[in-house]
Amino acid sequence: MSWVHPEMAAILASAPLAPDFQRLPLAEARATFGRLNATWNESTPALAEIRDLDIPTPWGAMAARLFRPSLAPRRPCIVFAHGGGWTFGSIETHRGTMARLALESDACVLGVDYRLAPECPFPAAVEDVCAALDAIIGGLAGDAVDPYRMALAGDSAGAAISLLTAVSTPWKPRLRAMALFYGCYLPVFDTASHGAYGIGFGLTTERMRWYWGNWRGPDTLPDLTELPPTYLNSPALDPLRDETLDLVRALADVGNDVTIDVYAGVIHGFMQMSAKLEPARAAHRAAGRFLSEKLK
């Protein structure tokens, strides 16, 4: 029997269960995902500025949102890719998470409304985050951002997008850090954590198979050499936990600076739940400390 944090248990007892998204019409599934996440944004912390931006791309303007913890000029900037199985989510569903990350790191956070699968499978989302990095380094936010102190971050599917962006972008030398929260990096479904937590702990193995079918991303890890210092975390009760632990080993094996935290008693997506869950707040603090130190 796996231990569940008391606050996590209370959330699970009171929160509406997520439906089988893969069995709903896509528009209905996306609207439902948005409603389920809206609760966690009701207590978004106040910041000095939250500004919407349009990022020009060859395929049209892309919405983005800049979170500034202070109005001090030339602050470091973290480009953030939201989770949602590459199929769901937006800069609105993850507003609270991005605001807290900005506060805890004392850095700007730029959230990106990348194109979603299945309409736009791999590599569309990676192209979009690369375009956001290009734009912010190119001065889109004016003097709010120091283009020489950049980082990438993301949760779940967004962690995979951020990792692939790091190995793809020509701005790799500008990246001081990465923060990857409970990511899905390979289409593997036979790990011990999938066996233990693939049913009954929120995210299911069946849904992950569906997400990967929408995304159609790479089935091998990219070249991981010479990446910036990387912070990773995982909930203990997550079917994706072993993917994170395997990535930690792969990063370390090629000489990267890697930090890992595993949070007991919580499930996939727990950082969205900061309003009611102390381990989520602790995870934001830990990630913020890491990013703040690396972005000095």
Regions found by a protein language model. Give the residues of each.
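A glycine/proline-hinged amphipathic helix-loop "lid/cap" segment
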Residues: 1-69, 296
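Short amphipathic alpha-helix adjacent to the substrate-entry channel of hydrolases
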Residues: 92-111
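Catalytic active-site module of serine/aspartate enzymes centered on a nucleophile-bearing elbow/loop
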Residues: 277-296
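Alpha/beta-hydrolase active-site loop
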Residues: 120-140, 287
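Hydrolase active-site cap/lid region
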Residues: 167-216
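Gly/Ser-rich "nucleophile elbow"/oxyanion-hole loop immediately N-terminal to the catalytic nucleophile
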Residues: 137-152
